[in-house]
Amino acid sequence: MSLSPINQTNLFSLDNYLSEFVELYKKKRLPTKILLSGDKGLGKSTLAFHLVNYILSINEEHPYIIKESKINPDNKSYKLVINGSNPNILLVDTLSEKKNIDINQIRELINNLNKSSFNNKERFIIIDNIETLNISSINALLKVLEEPPSNTYFILINNDRFILPTLKSRCINFKISLDHKTSILVINKILDSDIMKFINKDLLNYYLTPGQIYYLIEFFKIQKHDLKDYD
């Protein structure tokens, strides 16, 4: 099982944030530069993809299912994202072999932004792990944020780490959070199981988000250790 945000058709316990963004979009007040801040593993990237899918699939045959906070897997925009070929979504993240988002990735982003759009839909730039941008990357990104292309939205995702005030000041910051009890309920839904049956409660108190808990469980599965033995 993968928790890759691109593949998550369900949005767990962040539907209140999605509703807020949807209302802003309907009123034509959705900020074009959004910063989602919060602990790693909350589902901020998943939230971003759900918002984008809602907007891009509005006039499609199988639009986003807003009442269920769920992506319809049959909609065209979702299928294009899964195949890595949606022209209206550009994703920037740390590459597997690197620790930082480097200047070449931002240059490639700028080059793609300078190309004409294939359709009249909005374009969305999702930059995950924004705190890993190096200075050169930040400076290049700032220039784009100061004069963004028309009909283009930037969604920057920060895992509650320090980012330069000059970058933060360009965006509207939305603080994302879940209490620990809700995080446990979310991971139970994801795994379709009660994790309290196989994980020590004291150990669980050190892992605060669904993503953190999930990867803890996966790590111990690989190591073939019993989580009940750890506290």
Model-derived regions: residue spans:
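Flexible beta-alpha connector loops of hexameric P-loop NTPases
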Residues: 95-103, 130, 173-174
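Conserved alpha-helical scaffold flanking the Walker A/P-loop in AAA+ ATPase domains
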Residues: 19-25, 75-81, 100-124, 132, ...
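Residues immediately C-terminal
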Residues: 97, 132, 147, 162
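Structural recognition of the conserved hydrophobic beta-strand(s) that form the central parallel beta-sheet
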Residues: 124-128, 141, 152-158
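Charged, glycine-rich active-site and insertion segments that engage polyanionic ligands
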Residues: 1-50, 54, 60-80, 150-152, ...
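Conserved amphipathic alpha-helical interaction elements at protein-protein interfaces in regulatory
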Residues: 57, 115, 146-147
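Short loop/turn elements that form and flank the Walker-type P-loop nucleotide-binding site
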Residues: 29-30, 82-87, 119-121, 148-151
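A short hydrophobic beta-strand->loop->alpha-helix junction that borders the nucleotide-binding pocket
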Residues: 37, 91-96
